[in-house]
Amino acid sequence: MYQAGVDFGTISLTPILHGVVATVLYFLVGAAVLVAGFLMVNLLTPGDLRRLVFIDRRPNAVVLAATMYVALAIVTIAAIYASSNQLAQGLIGVAVYGIVGVALQGVALVILEIAVPGRFREHIDAPALHPAVFATAVMLLAVAGVIAAALS
């Protein structure tokens, strides 16, 4: 009679632990980039963006903040994907590209404010959804796409 046996070999948790540490560190860098993006939008828009989004529930502020998060997430994901196999170098790259993404998103918002008729900033705290917020959202996503493509 034959006995069924399964050989699992040696199990090493080292690669898993390295992956967990890398995941946590990339999360922290990514979260810092998102916070920087939120602060940048808060600086460029009238009023307290946190209050406009989470307390007053102003739809234009919500769309702008949410789109900024998605746009910066696209840049951060692309930066992680293109990052070095060396963890420290990869984290530095993601942080640098993330800050560049925040800066370019800010530049795009300023250019949009200058280039289009009217003042979109005046509609951020409006209780009604303004159509210009969608044009602004698409522009932010387009900028994120260009940055992400440049990283690949």
Curated annotation (Swiss-Prot):
The chain crosses the membrane at residues 21-41, 62-82, 92-112, 131-151. GO terms for cellular component: plasma membrane. It comes from the Bacteria. It is found in: Cell membrane. It is a multi-pass membrane protein. Keywords: Cell membrane, Membrane, Transmembrane, Transmembrane helix. Its main location: membrane. Belongs to the UPF0719 family. This is UPF0719 transmembrane protein Mb2631.
